[in-house]
A protein has these predicted regions:
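Catalytic domains of cell-wall/extracellular-matrix polysaccharide-remodeling enzymes
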Residues: 1-98, 102-103, 108-112, 116-120
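N-terminal secretory targeting signals
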Residues: 122-125
Length: 125
């Protein structure tokens, strides 16, 4: 309401396969479905998420290896102060994606939803 934009998508903190809750994730998924929300996860993780010392080159290489492995890749990246390499790596990642004639698409209802909880990691190439 505050932004005037209505979203239809939800990303679970930690993903739909998270073990960080004592409640069943399926209960949350059922509520989302009942309210016509779609949830999505990721199948590629930027290396700097788990390694604060990752270099720009490591981030680019790690992300591109993941992107190359899937027909549909959803990349988890954080734009936060303690992950500065994400922002620094993005121009190189985008350039490489375009050079390979891959598409950069927004999240929308037509995409293949990557969902950890139902086992959909999307088939590799």
């Amino acid at each position: 309401e505050a932004t005037g934009v209505h979203t239809k998508f939800y990303r679970f903190p930690g993903g739909s396969s998270t073990q960080n809750t004592s409640l069943s994730i399926q209960n949350f998924i059922d509520v989302l479905k009942k309210n016509h929300y779609l949830y999505l996860d990721w199948n590629v993780i930027s290396p700097d998420i788990n390694n604060a010392n990752a270099t720009k080159e490591q981030v680019v290489t790690g992300v591109m290896q993941g992107v190359d492995a899937y027909d549909t890749a959803v990349v988890l990246m954080y734009d936060v102060a303690d992950k500065p390499m994400t922002v620094k790596a993005l121009p190189s990642i985008i350039k490489q994606i375009k050079a390979k004639n891959y598409e950069l698409l927004p999240v929308d209802e037509s995409m293949i939803l990557i969902q950890h909880n139902n086992g959909n990691q999307e088939e590799g190439k």
